[in-house]
């Protein structure tokens, strides 16, 4: 809903060419703002109302391994904590009513980007496993109440509420 907030420890945002084309493909921005082709400033930390299109972004080299999605009005949320050394990037997909009528926010911890494996491999931006090699990672999901914005989620799942907006 438009009352939803996304907090992540991101610095950079890269626009994927998928979507409604509001931002220049592969353009780079500072979290949480993205400037559209028309000069409009989008705040990716706030979910816009339905009907606002659809887009896909990469948040490379996040500072810590977590993200939080909070309903600011109800003051409830969900967070995910994961090992940053395994998943150093986030993918952010927003279908805001403009793609198949879906209204959703999808945040995915990722080992590489972009989502096209051949391109990620060409750019040296994907993880590799040797034949027979296995990878295990501990991922922690947390639910919380009484918080409108998140400053940080500690590795053990402790929510640190933002006191004056979010530093990210």
Regions found by a protein language model. Name each.
Residues 1-79:
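Active-site/ligand-binding surface loops and adjacent short beta/alpha elements
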Residues 145-168:
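Terminal connector regions
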